[in-house]
Amino acid sequence: MKKVGAIILAAGMSKRMGKPKLLLSLGGKPLFRYSVNTATAAGLKPIVLVGGKHIEELRKHTSDLREIEIIENRDYESGMASSLKAGIQALKGRTDAVFVFLADQPFVPPIVITKLLESYDQYRKEGVRIFRPKYNNVLGHPVLFDAELFDEFEQIQGDEGGKSIVQKHYSSLMAVPFENSEWGFDIDTTEDLLKLKRIAPKYIKQK
């Protein structure tokens, strides 16, 4: 069995939201904890949580989880790429592959991770290096990258994340389908926040 870790990107500035969305309370927990909990429930190790301006709050809200490694990205204002590079650097040589999670997607269930891992085990030997969930025909996160691609993250810049790597290696990508589009829901705007509150009771026990 390959060793698979996780990077959870939690250093965003929430410019479109106007407030730190990852600390918003949902079901008695800050929003980012749902991605963390999904990664831990799936047995991913190591798990790296990359934070920025609100790093101390991230530490406080994960103090019960010894397995979480928190990395401070002091260059968080430059965009997502700097956080992703910091996470990859922390996991180089320690994992065979890594999931890249967005910290504002609270509805991704562990079954998504399980199915992607099963696909990785089955198809890596056939040359597939990127595995992505496809929620009701829309590609989403978390994305699983094989360690063979880690060096390429050194070239990414700004807010692109891993997009350029996905495009470059699209022929080596496998999309794993899921019917539920809400599993891939993320929060960027106040309108998204309203939708979040509307659909959350279906997935999260409210407190």
Q: What are these model-derived regions, one by one?
A:
Residues K2, D151, Q155-K207:
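Conserved alpha/beta core of the MobA/IspD/sugar-nucleotide pyrophosphorylase nucleotidyltransferase superfamily
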Residues K2-G52, L58:
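N-terminal glycine-rich phosphate-binding loop and ensuing alpha1 helix
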Residues M17, L58-T62, L116, F153, ...:
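Hydrophobic packing residues within well-ordered alpha-helices of enzyme cores
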Residues S25, F107, V143-L144, A175, ...:
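Short aromatic/basic micro-patch
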Residues L26, I71-N73, P133, V176-F178, ...:
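Hydrophobic residues at beta-strand termini and immediately following loops
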Residues Y34-A97:
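Conserved N-terminal catalytic core of the sugar/cofactor nucleotidyltransferase
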Residues E77-D151:
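Conserved beta-loop-beta/alpha segment of the NTase-like Rossmann-fold superfamily
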